[in-house]
Amino acid sequence: MAASMCDVFAFCAEQEPARRTVEIRFVSSGKGKGLFAIRTIRKGETIFQEKPLVSSQFQWNALYRYRACDHCLRSLETAEENAQRLSGNAHVLLPYPELCTVRNGLHQQCPRCQVTYCSAECLKAAAEQYHQILCLETSRDNPAHPLNKLEEAWRNMHYPPETASIMLMARMVGTIKQAQDKDWWLHLFSQFCNKTANEEEEIVHKLLGEKFKGQLDQLRRLFVDALYEERMSRWFTPEGFRSLFALVGTNGQGIGTSSLSQWVHACDALELPPRDREKLDALIDQLYKDIEKVTGEFLNCEGSGLYLLQSCCNHSCVPNAEASFPDNNFILHLTALEDIQPGEEICISYLDCCQRDRSRHSRQKILRENYLFMCSCPKCLAQADEPDITSEEEEEEEEEDDAELEGEPEDAELEDEMTDV
């Protein structure tokens, strides 16, 4: 590729506008680098759009029939098909079907293994980057294939709600093995935040639970069997594999796509007579109520990716920007939540909306356990004198989170969460 060895803008959809808008600066030894505005950025403005270096759908999400493009994670169901499955009602009919952007006629399959892509462009992109190495050919349903054994082992260790994917690491390896310029890709992956050995162990512990040491060694052996490459031999050692695991656990950006959500946003933009608007809004409200009863919180095709420029954004509990996926694929849009002045740091939140509303103590606990830092944003500094206590409701939620980490959920619980999806 033509990009320079240190080009953090290489995967932006429009590189030059991004270069004129933001820059990378060193912040501190604790924070490392950060993303800063070069010019005034207005509230609601898209700061940049970026493709990931690699991405992958979560294993359980794919297993439970959340059909997504194997490359860009675009939802392959039409909005109506999506609504029918999520609500458990095959008779759901959506008005304004022309607002759905999914085109089944464009879908393509790998001729060797039959995985599905949303378009010929995605099939080609995957084949050129990593799929020639990772294609299962006729062994897609063969449990003895090394890659299938690796995926099965991962599913038995990391249950919903999912936060990482072993196949993201596999695609990193596949990308380098298949690349002509292997050093370029190795350098790109080296740009992501690295941790000390003790910090890496904490991240692995968080992802795999109490038995993480034995599980990590099992995963590493399967990873070696499936993907070993001499050029990246360090990644396959116990220390290197732990580092690779921690890199994905710390830097992986969650991706969510939904053809139904995209259709709803398109409906919101329609100019309708008041009575028609009221009728449409009532239909959508009832649909989401029905979906919540059947599906709960699992609405999207979900996965994670590594984004070179976006990974430079530090956290704040009062972010001035947010990442989203409005195109129903893996293209990340970073959007300003408020006016941002030249020289001001651009921060996102690593916490969801509910977590940001928790007490300072609870927020710090989540950030410390998942990202290994203590937040010093304006909100946390303003609340520094608050006692280190949590509400009863927050304690219950934390106990549930901790219980998920301690071991495997019961099969019945999984069925309750994801049945009929």
UniProtKB/Swiss-Prot annotation:
Q: Which residues cross the membrane?
A: none
Q: What is its EC number?
A: 2.1.1.-, 2.1.1.372, 2.1.1.359
The entry's cellular-component GO terms read: cytoplasm
Classification via Gene3D superfamilies: 1.10.220.160, 6.10.140.2220, SET domain
* Swiss-Prot/TrEMBL GO biological process terms: methylation; negative regulation of gene expression, epigenetic; positive regulation of cytoplasmic translational elongation; regulation of stem cell differentiation; regulation of stem cell division
InterPro entries from the UniProt entry: SET_dom, SET_dom_sf, SMYD5_SET
Zinc finger intervals, MYND-type: 97-135
* Ranges where the SET domain occurs: 20-351
Q: Where is this region: Disordered?
A: 386-421
Instruction: Write out the catalysed reaction.
Output: L-lysyl-[protein] + 3 S-adenosyl-L-methionine = N(6),N(6),N(6)-trimethyl-L-lysyl-[protein] + 3 S-adenosyl-L-homocysteine + 3 H(+); L-lysyl(20)-[histone H4] + 3 S-adenosyl-L-methionine = N(6),N(6),N(6)-trimethyl-L-lysyl(20)-[histone H4] + 3 S-adenosyl-L-homocysteine + 3 H(+); L-lysyl(36)-[histone H3] + 3 S-adenosyl-L-methionine = N(6),N(6),N(6)-trimethyl-L-lysyl(36)-[histone H3] + 3 S-adenosyl-L-homocysteine + 3 H(+)
Q: Which UniProt keywords apply?
A: Cytoplasm, Metal-binding, Methyltransferase, S-adenosyl-L-methionine, Transferase, Zinc, Zinc-finger
Q: Where does S-adenosyl-L-methionine bind?
A: 350
Q: Give compartment(s).
A: Cytoplasm
Keyword field contains Cytoplasm: yes
GO MF term set: histone H3K36 trimethyltransferase activity; histone H4K20 methyltransferase activity; histone H4K20 trimethyltransferase activity; protein-lysine N-methyltransferase activity; zinc ion binding
- The main place the protein resides is cytoplasm
- What does the sequence similarity comment in the record state about its family? Belongs to the class V-like SAM-binding methyltransferase superfamily.
Primary role: Protein-lysine N-trimethyltransferase that specifically catalyzes trimethylation of 'Lys-22' of the RPL40/eL40 subunit of the 60S ribosome, thereby promoting translation elongation and protein synthesis. May also act as a histone methyltransferase in the context of histone octamers, but not on nucleosome substrates: trimethylates 'Lys-36' of histone H3 and 'Lys-20' of histone H4 to form H3K36me3 and H4K20me3, respectively. The histone methyltransferase activity, which is independent of its SET domain, is however unsure in vivo.
UniProt name for this protein? Protein-lysine N-trimethyltransferase SMYD5
